[in-house]
């Protein structure tokens, strides 16, 4: 691994924590300042006393080792580290690849036996960033209310024909799964009880979450079913992106980090207190050589073992730039990396060295979410009741224009008028994620209801479709929240991380209730996929071919000219009209064919006319070409 070699590190320092063969199992735990380490072997994943305890021996670089003879498959293990005269408590270690129920004990399994049929020929799909269209989904939300689901709320739901057909019909090319590693907040022993969590509370970073498996008591099941899910999606041409949360752990004192290497993996402030840049009680120290190497090995493990196509990095702004660049270097080029270019609080590390959105220009091949585009379309994150462009409020054009070009430098974007960022922060347009809503904050329907008092269903649909037109015609990487294609709401809940299924589940009945919404999303995605002008992928090409038109308030208009990106259409005009009245936009006189108009999409053409003025109906988008 070039990135690790450059730092003088050992490629398998963490990844080789447990090595199983039928003849014996080798254990190797990093515990650099330990006085002693005991290895406990258990017959079960929970309860009972150890069937064997082995005193591990200290080797080089603070790695403690032990070898236990015989076939241990099906057994469980923990480590117990002694440091400064104190036993730190049992832990499955730092890099468990399989665990018992609730992740308290590591499990010894034959990883090769978890590979589903055809796994050896499965690969990450290798899509270019320009071909990625992201669908963000929570494992439980997506399937728990689907009547014909055989495995509601489980990894295997995404192998079922109805699920695959929905995603393929919509046209998305990648599914982004909210945290699916082993997290702490759901009790896997009592899944009969109502429980819900998004999963941003890491326990074991390198094991799939047990509550999404059909049997969390059998360690190999969650591993195999995650792989089955990945393979089914790959077979359908859908890439798999995992949401990863390395910026904090569920807590400090009971974490696997703290029970092996106290205070090594966490930052402290000048007062010696644990820093909380995550807003969750702690923040990890990615700049520390051990945490840096841990992250690199963990990313690479998921990419290699589970054939993942990409990663969404939670609170990426907590991590340092150097570590993010090393992760980028360690992974294949077409494994997508994007993240939140901010933190949730002040970090105990210089801000100029953090992977913030403003520093994305220093991280080639890594993207960040554009809150400029999001908030200029729907309103600020800080106030759910404030509206913006969708309510035809003035002053938001430049921010939307920045989002349209992918937050790159463009001669027609005045960044002094852009919200949050006063200069371009992306070198290439594919370093910007274009979106209007995600799992965080109000979903788009709820935001429209909160920010535009008295809004009716027809107007809500018009504005919903208008907002997504900006997203899917952006030169950035388009990103949508699952269920928005069926007009999803969350009953106005702003932060639904522990809300019940009644709030978070997808409203599948809406597919029949609002078929025009799905058809429009489907059409926009098909338009983007069919026409390279909307995904040029190069800042130089965007500056050459994308030209904004002079228009009044409540409007954004641009032209993709001269067969941009080799497109079959010579010039494409996109007009977004948030006003409550129709507007006219001047264009060169020519014969134009409309493909998006008045809430409908037809790539073969809706209407053709020769004109020098485009009439754009109220609260809608118009796309024409010549």
Task: Label each region the model flagged.
Residues 3-22, 58-136, 141-152:
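The feature marks proteins involved in alpha-glucan
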Residues 23-27:
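Structural beta-strand segments of beta-rich domains
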Residues 31, 73-77, 606-626:
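C-terminal beta-strand-rich structural cap/linker in extracellular carbohydrate-active enzymes
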Residues 31-36, 579-580, 589-591:
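Short proline/glycine-enriched turn/loop motifs at strand-loop junctions of beta-rich domains
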Residues 100-102, 106-109, 113, 328-487, ...:
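Conserved alpha/beta catalytic core and glycan-binding cleft of carbohydrate-active enzymes
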Residues 138-306, 316-332, 336-339, 347-348, ...:
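Substrate-binding/active-site clefts of carbohydrate-active enzymes
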Residues 416-421, 476-493, 503-572:
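Glycan-recognition and catalytic regions of carbohydrate-active enzymes
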Residues 460, 473, 506, 524-526, ...:
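C-terminal accessory region downstream of the catalytic core in glycan-modifying enzymes
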